[in-house]
Amino acid sequence: MISLINHLKLTYCSIVLKSFKIYRNLSNILNRNYNKVNGWLFLDKPSGKSSNYVLQKIKKQFNINKLGFVGTLDPLASGFLPIAFGKATKTIRYIEKSYKEYLFSINWGIKTSTGDYEGEIVNTNKTIPDLKSIREALIKMKNIKRQTPHKFSAKKINGIRAYNLARKGVNFELSAQHINILEFDLKESQNNSATFYVKSSSGTYIRSLAETLSEMLGTFGFVSSLHRVGFGNLDKKLISLDSLLSLMHIDNLINIVRPLGCVFEDNNRLELKYDDAKKLFKGIPINLHEKEIKNFFLDSSSKNRIIAKYKDDLFVVGILDKITLYPKTVIDLRN
């Protein structure tokens, strides 16, 4: 009897050990696949979900740890949210200051505590601006250079989103900051609402724009819908969250992730030779030939930034000073 019990114990231990080995091998396979996911997806974030909620959903679905987004959209807003996978997270800083494009609607005659439809009504009137007044006000709006973010915005205060603090009733102040409105156009006007398109610098808050425009027109207004339609020069072909999650497996994800360098302009690209790649990998600047430099488009917008690659092994973001290329971000793609 004792012998039988010992035999059963050994058999159980053997099964557990084999299961562990299978699990470990499966984990290694998953990790190898994870290491291959280095690139970008441009997500159409649904309204009602925070940017971080979406990120955590993707992490859990595909068992990915290294993941990030750029250009936070608060829960009310929907639209363009760039997601960086793996080593692409090292390039987030190069696009976070890109201009943004939005479509949004204002409902006239009502002021809410949050600047949108979720807040409590704090004031009302019956003034509905006419088309002529709106168009005249938009011309003035384009000249605004400083803006105080709305308390129900995604602006961070000591690491906490302003809208989270505001919902908890925390008293705080936000400082005015520089903005640049490149375009501000009326797209549609109905009885008590209007839809607008705006193209503006990073850090422009649409709720604040809507309230400023309403005040300029002698009325109240709140944002009833907000959709980001553009992000710098990035491709505007987006994938919905439902479509992304329906892929189920990381191998399917790998097939649709955009290349790591897709967030950079195509003008200033350089294919490296082996010896130059070795130097840049070690952080050593290299000198370029004049004929190579002639092919580059260098101006204030490019910031003399050069994207250099060696096969599919090395990706470098560098700054060109005269003939010398200084590596700023070096990404080893071999593992």
Give residue ranges: language-model regions:
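A structural signal for short, well-ordered beta-strand segments
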Residues: 104-106, 184, 196, 226, ...
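The conserved catalytic core of RNA pseudouridine synthases
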Residues: 58-64, 82, 171-203, 207-218
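Accessory RNA 3′-end/elbow-binding domains used by RNA modification enzymes
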Residues: 2-46, 52-73, 77-80, 98, ...
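Short, structured patches in soluble enzyme cores that scaffold and shape functional sites
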Residues: 106-108, 156, 167, 188, ...
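Short, charged/polar surface micro-motifs in flexible loops or helix N-caps
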Residues: 86-90, 111
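Acidic, low-complexity central loop/insert segments
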Residues: 94-149
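Residue-level signal for inorganic ion chemistry
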Residues: 83, 104, 159, 209, ...
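Extended alpha-helical targeting/anchoring segments
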Residues: 153, 157-176, 180-182
